[in-house]
Amino acid sequence: MFFGERFFTTAMAKVSNKANKIIKKEAVFKRLSENRYAKFQYEILETIEAGIELLGTEVKSIRNGSVNLRDGYCSFRDGEILLLNVHISPHKNVGPFFNHDPLRNRKLLLHKKEIVKLKYNTEKKGLTIIPLSIYLKGSWIKLTIGIGKGKKLHDKRQADKQRDIKREIKTALKR
């Protein structure tokens, strides 16, 4: 084995190790909580992935799955988007002094262009921003928010009918 061959094999080993680490990080995707109620109440037109500004005890609670997105919504303050009314339970193994407020307002981390677009959609078009799901992406906790239009009662009934028809078609095709 000559010098160049040895150098080439070690370089390839380093590249493959880096590639394996990248593949392992991308493979981790774990849904922690989902807002199924939002899909029933709103017609979701577009979804956006956002980061959340969290405290340490909130991260622990979310990883345990003790988060409720059902009543949550987003609002604008001082050019920022805040996540309001999302309940993250206090962590069990921490004393009350170090724990967080379960319903505190949390800042969403988005690019300025996305914030401007969302603000335009909510103010001009009368749409609502709703949290849809919260999940782990690698080691980061991410939130999927949706731009939605509220459904009326007849829209909900029509969606139920369409769902029933699809279900009947699937059962008929299985036979």
Curated annotation (Swiss-Prot):
The keyword Cytoplasm applies. One of its GO terms (biological process) is trans-translation. InterPro entries: SmpB, SsrA-bd_prot, SsrA-bd_prot_CS. Keywords: Cytoplasm, RNA-binding. Coiled coil: none annotated. One of its GO terms (molecular function) is RNA binding. Its main location: cytoplasm. The keyword Kinase does not apply. Signal peptide: none annotated. It is found in: Cytoplasm. It comes from the Bacteria. GO terms for cellular component: cytosol. NCBIfam families: PRK05422.1, smpB. PANTHER family: SSRA-BINDING PROTEIN (PTHR30308:SF2), TMRNA-BINDING COMPONENT OF TRANS-TRANSLATION TAGGING COMPLEX (PTHR30308). Belongs to the SmpB family. Required for rescue of stalled ribosomes mediated by trans-translation. Binds to transfer-messenger RNA (tmRNA), required for stable association of tmRNA with ribosomes. tmRNA and SmpB together mimic tRNA shape, replacing the anticodon stem-loop with SmpB. tmRNA is encoded by the ssrA gene; the 2 termini fold to resemble tRNA(Ala) and it encodes a 'tag peptide', a short internal open reading frame. During trans-translation Ala-aminoacylated tmRNA acts like a tRNA, entering the A-site of stalled ribosomes, displacing the stalled mRNA. This is SsrA-binding protein. The gene is smpB.
